[in-house]
């Protein structure tokens, strides 16, 4: 364990009053809020008809299952604590019913049109069905090969009670597997809007059970692709049923600039009402998952040497677009935009915590690099790594083995897990179960980093990740503690990323090194030398001869200006370890360069930010 403190530390001051009461007796729970089964149209069309919610829950609980994609036994190394089966609300369950010959679906204009282009249900034919549905559902009907309107598709295989049976089965599965105190099965779905091809997807879940969930059908992008309509529906349905919804956006990296916008989808300036609605319903963002990492991009954060991580530019439309990144596509840029918008309208619409989840379409939350089940049927086997996935122009090896959500909750129940999301006391990892505590305040000392109970000091003197710093005396200080995943690589370093808004309304960012392994010293540019790399490229094995099992530190902002709004979050980096594509390349006997991906990666964790807002 290494304990480190940087910055000029202040003497202990009385902590200013914190705005909201927060629990202090929290434990770490691991989960996945984004998992698909064959009730999702794309899972079925990608050739995985045997994936069920029951399979997903059994797998998440650590039980061995027969893989729906390979037919072999698959099992997590350690169980998860919670799971959301979040099948696409659009046509939920309808595609399996179509190909099983259910006349309610098959004997319609849409059903007949889709069956006509897939008479034998070959891989190519099912991909064609998928492409047509995506184009029509995205408002790109003119580019489709079949003469079918979105209105007709909705009427035939989505509208009315056509989804009721599958939704009820989804609810029943969650009720069967929910075991308060041991395993939490949350009821949820995915709203899968992609107007003009830009990803605006949200996963929605709630702490309530069947008595509430059975009162509605999940809102989908076939009702509206505008997130403002989703928020209105959440508000209205919450008032009618008592559902305490949470909506989690994901994959801003493929949103073509629409995710953290400066104007609404309809082209109006963002106003206070928009900002308040978004902030109310969306407390966190899924920053890392199989379809890439959305924390930062090297073109947007050119001075950040670790911004180049699992970049994934492949928009989901069949045309194969890979647009350049914009500030609307990445979370760090979005956090900065939020500060600027708050200065204009009084509310920060992008005041979000960060989590990871899988977006697995295999029915299994399997994202360990050496136990990766792939995104779906098209990239499950090593030899499929160079093959198209059916998702835009991506190939199997473009998929990253990520991620999970770490949640600091009072207990493992639906209510406590959702409460932690709402107060943003959650964080993201790219897969390894790195334990991270992060607190901000005005009285942390070096001794706090060496305390036997860091959490007690953190809660007593400050606010945890997701919190707001009240205005205090002097510059704020931050207490961070990270411990490695017991079966993964050691830790390289802990950094704090700061973003702020200056007096001229311009935003800035900076990466600070806080604590690190070994005797390295930062250079004149503030950057640390690389830690090294123990990965054997012939075998895919590595050793923990470098790095530390735990890193703790206290850091005080040396550039603090009390007049500038700011956010701070911690990023924890592992030592280099083999990427799943390296292991595939070794197994296949091909050059790792043929995968188009790096041989090794530095897995990481991102905490939710802590915000500072001047009184004025």
Task: Label the predicted regions.
Residues 89-90, 125, 129-184, 198, ...:
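Long, well-ordered early-domain segments
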Residues 20-53, 57-60, 67-116, 156-159, ...:
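C-terminal functional module detector
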């Amino acid at each position: 364990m290494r304990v480190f403190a940087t910055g000029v530390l202040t003497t202990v001051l009385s902590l200013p009053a914190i705005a909201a009461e927060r629990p202090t007796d929290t434990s770490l729970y691991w989960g996945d809020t984004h998992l698909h089964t064959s009730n999702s149209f794309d899972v079925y069309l990608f050739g995985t008809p045997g994936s069920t919610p029951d399979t997903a829950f059994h797998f998440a609980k650590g039980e061995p299952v027969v893989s729906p994609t390979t037919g072999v036994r698959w099992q997590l190394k350690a169980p998860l604590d919670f799971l959301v089966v979040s099948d696409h609300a659009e046509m939920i369950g309808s595609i399996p019913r179509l190909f099983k010959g259910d006349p309610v679906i098959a004997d319609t204009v849409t059903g007949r049109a889709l069956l006509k282009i897939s008479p034998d249900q070959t891989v190519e034919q099912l991909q064609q069905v998928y492409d047509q549905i995506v184009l029509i559902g995205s408002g790109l009907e003119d580019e489709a090969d079949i003469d079918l309107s979105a209105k007709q598709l909705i009427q035939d295989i989505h509208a009315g009670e056509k989804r009721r049976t599958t939704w009820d089965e989804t609810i029943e599965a969650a009720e069967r597997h929910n075991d308060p105190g041991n395993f939490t099965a949350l009821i949820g779905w995915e709203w899968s809007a992609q107007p003009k091809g830009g990803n605006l997807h949200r996963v929605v879940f709630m702490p309530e059970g069947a008595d509430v969930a059975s009162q509605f059908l999940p809102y989908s992008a076939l009702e509206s692709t505008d997130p403002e309509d989703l928020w209105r529906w959440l508000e209205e349905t919450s008032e009618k049923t008592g559902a305490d919804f949470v909506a989690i956006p994901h994959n801003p990296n493929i949103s073509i600039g629409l995710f953290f916008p400066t104007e609404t989808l309809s082209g109006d300036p963002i106003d206070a009402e928009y900002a308040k609605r978004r902030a109310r319903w969306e407390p966190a963002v899924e920053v890392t998952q199989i379809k890439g990492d959305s924390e930062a991009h090297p073109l947007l954060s050119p001075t950040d040497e670790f911004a180049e991580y699992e970049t994934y530019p492949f928009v989901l439309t069949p045309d194969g677009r890979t647009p350049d990144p914009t500030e609307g596509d990445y979370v760090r840029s979005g956090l900065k935009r939020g500060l600027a918008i708050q200065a204009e309208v009084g509310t920060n619409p992008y005041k979000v915590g960060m989590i990871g989840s899988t977006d697995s379409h295999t029915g299994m939350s399997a994202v360990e690099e050496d136990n990766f089940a792939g995104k779906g049927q098209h990239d499950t086997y090593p030899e499929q790594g160079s093959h198209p996935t059916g998702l835009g122009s991506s190939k199997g090896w473009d998929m990253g083995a990520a991620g999970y959500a770490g949640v600091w909750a009072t207990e493992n129940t639906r209510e406590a897990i959702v409460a932690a999301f709402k107060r943003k006391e959650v964080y993201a990892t790219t897969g390894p179960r790195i334990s991270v505590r992060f607190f901000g305040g005005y009285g942390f000392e070096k001794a706090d980093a060496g305390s036997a109970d860091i959490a007690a000091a953190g809660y007593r003197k400050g606010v945890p990740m997701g919190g707001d710093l009240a205005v205090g005396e002097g510059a704020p200080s931050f207490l961070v503690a990270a411990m490695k995943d017991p079966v993964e690589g050691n830790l390289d370093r802990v950094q704090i990323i700061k973003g702020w808004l200056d007096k001229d309304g311009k935003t800035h960012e900076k990466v600070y090194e806080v604590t690190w392994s070994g005797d390295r010293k930062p250079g004149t540019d503030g950057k640390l030398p690389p830690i090294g790399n123990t990965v054997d490229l012939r075998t895919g094995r590595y050793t923990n001869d470098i790095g530390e099992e735990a890193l703790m530190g206290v850091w005080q902002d040396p550039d603090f200006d009390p007049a500038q709004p700011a956010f701070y979050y911690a990023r924890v980096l592992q030592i280099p370890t083999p990427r799943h594509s390296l292991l595939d390349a070794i197994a296949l006997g091909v050059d790792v360069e043929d995968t188009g991906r790096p041989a090794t990666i530095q897995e990481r964790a991102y905490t939710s930010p802590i915000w500072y807002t001047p009184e004025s």
